[in-house]
């Protein structure tokens, strides 16, 4: 949506939300979307007419302060550019092995390997999980692919007249992989963190797993943050037993909390599937609200319950992704925010306190444990106000925690550095 709006707005820079949306020049499907969600149109317009130009000026003034954070992120982006992307429909690309002979020659393709029969679906699942971990995945779960959770069009490698209404038969199973972003960098969001470290690692793991499956004779397609998704990840992750859907709209896992970037590999290898889990996230999110209270854009619903918030047929807390993306483009350092990941009480490294809390809370019918934990986080740990994360003069481009030492430009770089401050 955002790219489509941007392309249309660049061709019609004098258009404003006071004009009919039909005059903007976006596809009819997007016209209908904006009519259903007019606030998204207002936010998209603000992002490209105001926020991005202002951010460019801010980077001229403050950019040196974030240069090492940008450099750190750029390394992952550079590697990600080498990862392969499907160039033909699933019925073609998923059934061939892509081989790159050398960097200066186009990749070659060869047929799938001879199909290897597994003794049982249980052993197939065990093998897949073992190799996925060794390919770099921290978490692995398996479920059946749900046609309701495929994107309605735009699958990679597919022409416009492709029939997107039918799920490819070989997308029977979905293997969901998850990895965390670097913990000390996560806490320095929204200004110093990057999504690309975990994007790169989970994408690499998924593409390796795709290659493994194809060698064994099974068609496969990796859906990754670096090379694109043809399906929606969070509900598949929930069904694969990795976690539960939180107030933020992403899957919160017992091991990593919200600090988990995910990829999916679809295939037809028969495997034993996992079951959804319940460790109390839904009830905890109802009373917590730390992510919503901290969100600089106000994109996360403050409602006590998602009752009545039905999006695409499923009930979950509303997220205004237009407001969210607008703040992405306001921040300094690598693009994005990730503040909701950083502040979430579940997003903590393993230690005895965190392990005890996540063990006791689901087993406490009184709610005393969760109430006590929330009181401690809200009263014993300092954090910037939501407004502080904005640009000066309203805020100071605050970070939830100070960046790790290796991202502090003032320590390493011989540059004139201006640190943002309120009113400055």
Show which residues each predicted segment covers.
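Flanking helices and flexible, charged tails adjoining ferredoxin-like Fe-S electron-transfer domains
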Residues: 1-20, 303-424
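Non-catalytic, usually N-terminal nucleic-acid engagement modules in DNA/RNA processing proteins
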Residues: 1-183
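Phenylalanine-focused residue identity feature
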Residues: 5, 9, 33, 37, ...
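Catalytic cores of enzyme domains
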Residues: 129, 138-349, 354-364
């Amino acid at each position: 949506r955002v790219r489509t709006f941007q392309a249309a707005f660049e061709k019609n820079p004098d258009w404003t939300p006071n004009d009919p949306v039909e005059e903007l020049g976006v596809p009819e499907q997007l016209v209908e979307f904006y009519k259903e969600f007019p606030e998204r149109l207002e936010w998209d317009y603000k992002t490209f007419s105001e926020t991005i130009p202002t951010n460019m000026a801010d980077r001229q003034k403050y950019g040196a302060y974030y240069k090492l954070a940008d450099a750190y992120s750029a390394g992952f982006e550079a590697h990600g550019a080498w990862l392969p992307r499907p160039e033909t429909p699933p019925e073609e690309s998923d059934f061939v092995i892509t081989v790159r002979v050398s960097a200066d020659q186009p990749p070659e393709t060869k047929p799938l390997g001879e199909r290897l029969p597994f003794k049982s679906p249980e052993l197939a699942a065990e093998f897949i999980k073992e190799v996925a971990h060794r390919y770099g995945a921290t978490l692995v779960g398996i479920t059946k692919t749900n046609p309701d959770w495929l994107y309605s069009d735009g699958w990679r490698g597919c022409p416009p007249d492709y029939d997107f209404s039918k799920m490819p038969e070989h997308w029977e199973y979905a293997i969901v992989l998850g990895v965390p972003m670097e913990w000390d960098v996560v806490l320095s969001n929204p200004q110093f963190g990057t999504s690309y470290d975990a994007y790169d690692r989970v994408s690499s793991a998924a593409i390796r797993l795709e290659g493994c499956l194809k060698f064994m004779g099974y068609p496969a397609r990796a859906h990754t943050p670096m090379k694109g998704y043809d399906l929606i990840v969070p509900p598949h992750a929930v069904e694969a037993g990795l976690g539960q859907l939180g107030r933020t709209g992403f899957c919160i896992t017992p091991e990593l909390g919200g600090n988990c970037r995910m990829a999916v590999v679809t295939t037809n290898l028969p495997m034993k599937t996992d079951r959804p889990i319940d460790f109390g996230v839904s009830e905890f999110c109802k009373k917590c609200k730390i992510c919503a209270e901290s969100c600089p854009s106000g994109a996360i619903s403050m409602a006590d319950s998602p009752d009545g918030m039905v999006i695409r047929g499923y009930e979950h807390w509303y997220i205004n992704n237009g407001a969210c993306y607008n703040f992405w483009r306001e921040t300094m350092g690598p693009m994005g925010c990730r503040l909701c990941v950083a502040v979430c009480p579940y997003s903590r490294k393993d230690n005895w306190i965190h392990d005890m809390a996540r063990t006791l809370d689901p087993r406490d019918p009184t709610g005393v444990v969760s109430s006590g934990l929330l009181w401690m986080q809200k009263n014993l740990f300092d954090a910037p106000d939501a407004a502080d994360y904005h640009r000066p003069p309203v805020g100071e481009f605050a970070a939830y925690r100070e960046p790790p030492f290796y991202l502090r430009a003032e320590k390493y770089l011989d540059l004139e550095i201006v640190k943002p401050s309120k009113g400055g």
